[in-house]
């Protein structure tokens, strides 16, 4: 067993020295002038307020008397003992969306199983609140699809998949000729489930880990193999895989061009059987989305996916490894992936760890001006996924496409939109 974690308080100088020795940071010569300008001007501004991180409430659930309707899910056939609560909840949500005013959807204590995606569409002023409740997905698909919702809140849940699409094992043997690695799997991982495809990875990854004394945890080994079959760039490093249920072992074979390097026996490895297939929370064309006091332990792709969302607020909503589990990966892609969003995006007091791809990927795009005259201009987006809605009162900035210098700033006074194109009237002559 690895050594137990010990909490040690470090002086600022010790932290800086530790960061310089971290395997993910490049080193600078002792006399490097570049080193002088590294980091923040005030190192004391860095840190975590543990009390705020664990307890601060920024978006509280109103008192029950403030709601026009309160829905206890048990009264609508939604119970922890059900094998699949998705059908009953989807029916209830169709009723809820026709009710005006503040609505409270309560999940009392328990583990609620869902075998399909739950769809929240065209709903305003809804609080989805777990009271020591877990939302557990038993199918490999998105947990929630939220579209065209406004003032939408998710509070107080744990979210997980059973089974999750990642497994953890320890290297027990390798075969140079076959370019293969055999892992002894942890007891919690049952790969007899058909979704594991007998051990062969269609889309997913193989990642080796190393024990880090500083963090008291396994972290990705920068000198080890990270190989994958990608849904995005069509890379295929993992050409074979087989699960032996009797021995509880998994053997992965690598392609000839994968850069195979046999790991040492005892190396910890995480293997995932999804990559980008399913976002866990799919927010699209929503306004004022709030998530607070939630823990997410696994996802089958990107975890929080936001397209064309105005104002996103997340507090104490963690993407973290589940305590007691041997899993080493949380999200098989990005933690938070935002595309074409606008307004506020505020994430506070939250932990994002062990994702396969970016912790946060905030994508931003631009419109291209095609013509202008007087105080009007025509501009357009390159695609629907990069199409920001432009509205009266918005401030737009015009940049030189070659130098990226700011040319001028205007306020929009009139908008005519047609598909991806916008005819804008602004507050002064262009």
Task: Give residue spans per PLM region.
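All-beta strand scaffolds that present successive hydrophobic residues in beta-strands
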Residues: 107, 126-131, 151-156, 265-268, ...
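Surface beta-loop-beta hairpin patches that serve as ligand-binding interfaces in beta-rich domains
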Residues: 6-62
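Ser/Thr/Gly-rich low-complexity blocks that favor extended beta-strand/coil architectures
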Residues: 161, 186-245, 385-421
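Acidic Gly/Asp/Thr-rich repetitive segments characteristic of extracellular carbohydrate-active
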Residues: 20-36, 41, 73-106
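Surface-exposed loop/turn segments connecting beta-strands in extracellular beta-rich domains
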Residues: 114-116, 123, 136-138, 152, ...
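Short glycine/acidic-rich loop motifs that flank beta-strands on beta-rich extracellular proteins
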Residues: 101-102, 114-118, 137-143, 163-168, ...
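N-terminal extracellular ligand-recognition/capping segment immediately after the signal peptide
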Residues: 86-93, 100-126, 131-145, 159, ...
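Long, low-complexity, polar/charged, intrinsically disordered or flexibly structured peripheral segments
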Residues: 214-285, 290-292, 297, 428-429
